[in-house]
Design a protein with these regions (language model features):
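Conserved catalytic-core motifs of GNAT/GCN5-like acyltransferases
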Residues: 68-79, 180, 200-210
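Conserved acetyl-CoA-binding loop-helix of GNAT-fold acetyltransferases
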Residues: 32-41, 151-153, 157-173, 191-196
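Acyl-donor-binding surface of acyltransferase catalytic domains
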Residues: 9-86
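Short amphipathic alpha-helix that is part of the acyltransferase structural core
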Residues: 72-108
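A conserved beta-turn-beta hairpin within the catalytic core of GNAT-like acetyltransferases
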Residues: 19-25, 138-146, 156
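Conserved active-site alpha-helix within GNAT-family acetyltransferase domains
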Residues: 55-68, 162, 185-203
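A conserved beta-strand-loop-helix scaffold within acyl/acetyltransferase catalytic domains
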Residues: 109-150
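Conserved beta-strand-loop-alpha-helix junction that forms the acyl-donor binding cleft
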Residues: 51-56, 153, 180-191, 207-210
Length: 210
């Protein structure tokens, strides 16, 4: 169950089992957010990981007892439908997805059967084999979410990831009006692909209880 709290200028929203973890999304001034996060974590438990703009999360880690900064990464989003032609399409199921992820992206947060992972899109080869995939996962009514991007090693360097991500982006923008994704800040190649699809980059971070 999603729950929300507010204190002064700060808002915290607890969402269980989102993108591999229990998440506590936080916005607002750190002076209000720190006592709010402290109280909320006492209520919901230490499994929830505060998430928000990097500067805010670093401030929370300095002010909330027992909370430590975990990692920074990128949040990218767009409300534009990409202008590209692609043969990518939604799969009828998830056959072959797990095997491709295991080979091409074993650290993916999105996997078939995981809570919130709704459907997979793919570009396929001549024999129907999966070449590049991406998922609609953890989407909310007003923001779709793209995850689980992977391309088979033999098919890399051909622009397939851009095509399948462009397809999913277009589908989610039409359905939710906005789409977002998370990306490692030290992955410039992926960031460049998403920028070409119209995404803008924002530095975010997560923290966790010791």
């Amino acid at each position: 169950m999603v729950r929300a709290w507010r204190q002064g200028d700060a808002v915290a929203v607890a969402s269980p089992d989102v993108s591999k973890h229990d998440r506590l999304a936080v916005i607002g001034a750190v002076e209000d957010a720190a006592p709010l996060v402290r109280d909320v974590l006492r209520e919901v438990g230490p499994s929830y990981r505060p998430f928000g703009d990097e500067e805010l999360v670093r401030g929370l880690a300095e002010r909330v007892p027992g909370l430590r900064f975990s990692a920074s990464f990128g949040w990218m989003d767009t409300s534009d439908v990409p202008d590209l032609t692609t043969t990518a399409a939604w799969l009828d199921g998830d056959a072959g997805v797990e095997a491709l992820l295991a080979e091409a992206s074993p650290k993916s947060y999105a996997w078939p059967g995981h809570p919130g992972v709704r459907r997979w899109a793919a570009l396929t080869g001549e024999r129907g084999e999966l070449l590049s995939i991406a998922a609609d996962a953890w989407s909310a009514p007003e923001v779709g979410f793209l995850a689980g991007v992977a391309t088979h090693p033999v098919a890399r360097g051909k622009g397939l990831s851009r095509q399948v991500c462009g397809f999913v982006t277009a589908e989610l923008v039409k359905r939710h009006r906005r789409v977002a994704l998370m990306v490692d800040g030290d992955n410039p190649a992926a960031i460049a692909v998403y920028r070409r699809l119209g995404y803008t980059y924002r530095r975010v971070a997560a923290a966790g209880m010791r």
